[in-house]
Amino acid sequence: MSKIIFHIDVNSAFLSWSAVEKLKNGNQVDLREIPSIIGGDEASRHGIVLAKSVSAKRYGVTTGEPIAQALRKCANLVMEPPNHKMYREYSRRLMEYFKTYTPDLEQLSVDECFLDYTPIAHLYGEPVAFANRLKNEIKETFGFTVNVGISEVKILAKMASDFEKPDKVHTLWKSEIRQKMWPLPVSELYMVGKSSLPKLRNLGIHTIGDLAQMNPEILEAHLKSFGKLIWQNANGIGSDVVESEETAAKGVGNSTTLREDVTDVQTAKKVLLELSESVSGRLRKSGFFAGNVAVEIKYSDFTKCSHQAPFLTPTNSTGKIYELSCRLFEELWNGAPIRLLGIRTSKLQDENEPVQMSLFDLDFSKEVKTEQSFTKGPNREKLEKLDKAMDDIKKRFGDGAIVRGSSLIKEKQSLSAQEE
């Protein structure tokens, strides 16, 4: 029996959430109704466009382009800086809302998720009707709109949600691929990017249908395993398994009980750095990327709390794990003395699998004030080389042979460590 999978995507999420928040705080102008963007620094006019309104799009403004270029296209463009903490909170509320219907939910990023409708179809009826109900409830409850794509497999549901926007429901059943998807430009297929387009065009591939009907062995010869993957995407071949938090439970983690209670942010972050080193090293040794990280705190009165968030791009980088862990810690910690700190990564995938890049690989925020020497900036290759160099030294001379300067603590903080 075929499954029924929803892909739900917030329309221009960062701009929508900023607009809703400003309206709640008394702003008279809706950012979604004027030429506006999210991104950059208004004073310096540096950075890139992270999200744009429909009217900004009419001026030719595109996501990912430099702010200065966008302003040349539209002189009266309104620019709003990003608020990542607020976006994560809106995302959390939305996911909790979906869970009132079903626990079978797989969050892909802050603004999109898969939902397995199959187990609840008998309760709510025809899927398109329920999807319309769902998107209308979101609009009324939260004030922003979503698109819902529906199919038997995840890749087609995701493609369907990218059809006409905003505030729409679309189906892309396997029987509809030839009619709805194959005529589209190949650039619109999920995971086909700028680097692969020239190679595809050299092979005479211009539409998704061209790709779908190409001999996959030829694609593999030119694009290696990636060629096979996009051929499968073009033919609607993919997983129908929605990996909820429960099914994606396997992960890599580490926690440490502290010799003395920690009462300041700086010391806590040094401990988080050491934990990030340990966890990321084990991920790299095992050949995994992590899609999610959680931070756990146990206070001196032995009460516990934890907070988790997805990475924008799956990673095994020490810097990225540390950066997000620090953000989670800052949101979670209530100021009480800390007895134990822990980090756990989950939603593991083989590091050889293709990874969808995020705009945030180009523009890290500056929320984390420590360790900027390796968390600030976009140079992914330098981060990977640093991690590899440290891994090689530890493998040859032992774990204590090299540490980052900022993790040198006068007195050893850790009493005991526990791996997961």
Predicted regions located by residue number:
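DNA-contacting surface of Y-family translesion DNA polymerases
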Residues: E188, S196-I338, E353
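Gly/Gly-Pro- and Ser/Thr-rich, intrinsically disordered tail segments characteristic of DNA damage-repair
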Residues: M1-Q232, G281, K369, G377-E420
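A glycine-rich phosphate-binding loop feature that marks nucleotide/adenosyl-phosphate handling sites
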Residues: E152-I155, A234-G236, F289-S300, I338-Q349, ...
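Preference for bulky hydrophobic residues occupying beta-strand positions
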Residues: I8, L115, V148, V295-I297, ...
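Acidic, metal-coordinating catalytic segment for phosphate/diphosphate chemistry
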Residues: F311-E420
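Short, charged/polar surface micro-motifs in flexible loops or helix N-caps
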Residues: N11-A13, E42-R45, S300-K304, L348-E351
